From Swiss-Prot:
The gene is dcd. It comes from Leptothrix cholodnii (strain ATCC 51168 / LMG 8142 / SP-6). Keywords: Hydrolase, Nucleotide metabolism, Nucleotide-binding. Its EC number is 3.5.4.13. One of its GO terms (molecular function) is dCTP deaminase activity. This is dCTP deaminase. The keyword Hydrolase applies. Pathway: Pyrimidine metabolism; dUMP biosynthesis; dUMP from dCTP (dUTP route): step 1/2.
Length: 189
């Protein structure tokens, strides 16, 4: 299994629709010249962007967080260019990009250091072979202060690994529960 380069990522995105919309280069400034958290193709990965759709964790109803019986009232829905995450809390978001992962590819998604250096941790599970959809992102604010996330800017990097042999059973074959997700998706069992 080997990590894939910028040339491979560009080819797969442009010929197979692996990433849509796709940015073939690295964007570091907004259209009006403002500095932003970079996104797009890097040497050995792709920096994904956060969309304007957020679910911010709240303790208004004092419910228990149970992954087997998750209460949607635990979140407040926000649509904005920025999301403020309360101290020691977290938020869910989704990528602007839609992914179609090939059958012989597995990805690993890592947070960007720009956010990590501010105490904001991004967690995303691997994108399995033949998974497709918008990625649900998990942001944890580990600080005692409110933290800001920017929509339309880079938030994490996806690394692509191509296997020497095709898997016997893909995510699609298993009927994976998060297949084809279109928005921020809460836990399913």
């Amino acid at each position: 299994m080997s990590i894939k380069s910028d040339k491979w990522i560009r080819r797969m995105a442009q010929e197979s629709g692996m990433i849509e919309p796709f940015e073939p280069g690295q964007v570091r400034q907004s259209a009006d010249g403002q500095k932003i958290v970079s996104y797009g193709t890097s040497s050995y990965g792709y920096d994904i962007r956060c969309a304007r759709e957020f679910k911010v964790f709240t303790n208004i109803y004092s419910t228990v967080v149970d992954p087997k019986n998750f209460d949607e009232k635990s979140f407040v829905d926000i649509e904005s260019d920025v999301c403020i995450i309360p101290p020691n809390s977290f938020a869910l978001a989704r990528t602007m990009e839609y992914f179609r992962i090939p059958r012989n590819v597995l990805t690993i998604c890592l947070g960007k250091s720009t956010y990590a250096r501010c105490g904001i941790i991004v967690n995303v599970t691997p994108f399995e072979p033949e998974w497709e959809g918008y990625v649900t992102l998990e942001f944890s604010n580990t600080t005692p202060l409110p933290a800001k996330i920017y929509a339309g800017e880079g938030c994490a990097q996806v690394l692509f690994f191509e296997s020497d042999e095709v898997c016997e059973t893909s995510y699609r074959d298993r009927g994976g529960k998060y297949q084809g997700q279109t928005g921020v998706t809460l836990p399913k069992t």
